[in-house]
Amino acid sequence: TSGTGIINHTFKEYKPCVININRNRKNGALISMSQGKAIPYALFNLQERGKLIIPSNIEVYEGMIIGFNSRENDLTVNPLKTKQLTNFRSSGADEAIVLTPETKITLEKAIEMINEDELIEVTPKEIRLRKRYLKEHERKKDQRSKN
């Protein structure tokens, strides 16, 4: 613009949103059962269960959704599981693990994906999904009270 710019703006009115967002996805969630760093070895084995939404070596906590199950039910998983080393296996053999790229979650995608028992955490660096009740026994208790 070389220092000169013209901006036009047109506004008619505010209206309530009339679009009904269907928030119920058919697949369940993969939920972390413990707190710590997600290990690539564990995530490699969890890839078969569904789509992951977190990269490896990221901090996770109990109740955090780390992926979406390929089936309808929620599944509590351990993303911190490490490979058992024996005298025959060396720790350098971990380098052969290749993870599929995680699904990036935007705020819009997160709003579309959440179920009634889930929440969205928005921080300056990340957007995370989590269960309303972080402890597994609290989630089961809530599920029983609904039925």
Annotate each language-model stretch with its function:
Residues 1-147:
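Accessory interaction regions appended to the cores of large information-processing enzymes
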